[in-house]
Each structure stands twice: as C-alpha cells, then as structure tokens.
Swiss-Prot record:
High-level lineage: Eukaryota, Viridiplantae, Chlorophyta, Mamiellophyceae, Mamiellales
Organism name: Ostreococcus tauri
Keywords from the UniProt entry: Chloroplast, Membrane, Photosynthesis, Photosystem II, Plastid, Thylakoid, Transmembrane, Transmembrane helix
Name recorded for this polypeptide: Photosystem II reaction center protein Psb30
Compartment(s) where it occurs, according to its Swiss-Prot or TrEMBL record: Plastid, Chloroplast thylakoid membrane
Signal peptide: none
C-alpha cells in the first residue's frame, strides 16, 4: 500500500470521527445560549 493512500485514509477517518463530535460540541454550546 502507498503511504499517500494510508495518509488519506487516516485523514478521512479522523475527519469522519471528529466531525460529529466537534459539530455536537458547537451545537451544544449554541443551544445553551
């Protein structure tokens, strides 16, 4: 496997994994206002 491909997969995994958490945190802060 190419390191570039692995890097892209890791990046996508991090974005998909952290995206909902970040959005949820921002939504929670906005909702508490």
């Amino acid at each position: 496997m190419n390191l570039e491909l692995i890097g892209q997969l890791v990046t996508v995994a991090l974005v998909v994994g952290a995206g909902p958490i970040i959005i949820g945190a921002l939504f929670a802060r906005g909702g508490n206002l």
